[in-house]
Design a protein with these regions (language model features):
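A structural motif corresponding to the C-terminal lobe/cap of the Radical SAM core domain
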Residues: 7, 24-214
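Glycine-rich Rossmann NAD(P)(H)-binding loop
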Residues: 19-23
């Protein structure tokens, strides 16, 4: 992997996105990469990803020194009950706001990723997630709808419950005209999708967010 970074540096590439959504997972892997970047004194501006429950404070100084200035966080949902239903085998309860603040204090910009429409999502929990995102006010945010991607636990559950699934690949896209997200027990897929679009607009026109990115 370090040879790829060597090639980037040789060709003057500064901005790098590491498209591994579990990059900050195994310290023996990502710390070794960071150490080699630091040893070479490369001046990169890196975007990397981490699960919210694997982003430990002791990693942040090393990540920052290697050039990781943006960290995409898989928050999914701030409601512990909803998250636990999806991640029964690997679920860990974490204080999300505290972790985000620690990341900010390390000089790294957090990018929060949220999912609307987990199996027992209600209108109240949708509102809670949006309000949480507004209060946390990260430099970047993504709002997704729960999608039954083939091979995922949600896909297996959807097939078991005879839920409608996309018949084309574009139906699995978050932003295609024929996107087909999952309904929850309490909300239709259309209601969840409409809320996602509303949340996107509300967040990015919110005065606190605009002040953050302007300053």
């Amino acid at each position: 992997i370090i040879k790829q970074f060597d090639l980037f540096a040789k060709n003057g590439v500064k901005n790098i996105k590491i498209a591994d959504e579990l990059f900050v997972l195994n310290p023996r892997h990502f710390i070794a990469i960071c150490d080699m970047i630091i040893e070479r004194k490369y001046d990169f501006n890196i975007w990397a990803y981490s699960r919210i429950d694997t982003c430990k404070p002791q990693y942040l100084e090393k990540l920052k020194k290697a050039g990781v200035n943006w960290l995409g966080l898989g928050i999914e949902n701030p409601n512990d009950v909803l998250r636990k239903e999806v991640h029964k085998d690997s679920y860990q309860e974490v204080k999300i706001k505290d972790i985000i603040q620690i990341i900010k204090n390390a000089g790294i910009y957090p990018a929060a990723n949220y999912i609307f429409g987990l199996p027992n999502e209600t209108q109240e929990s949708l509102d809670f997630t949006l309000n949480f995102a507004l209060e946390t006010n990260t430099e970047m945010v993504n709002f997704y709808c729960a999608m039954a991607y083939p091979g995922s636990p949600l896909h297996l559950t959807a097939k078991k419950d005879n839920l409608p699934l996309p018949s084309t690949y574009s139906g699995y896209s978050q932003h295609s005209y024929n996107t087909q997200n999952l309904p929850s027990v309490f909300l239709s897929s259309e209601e969840i999708l409409a809320f996602r679009d509303k949340a996107w607009k509300k967040y990015h026109t919110n005065s606190n967010y605009l002040n953050l990115i302007e300053n």
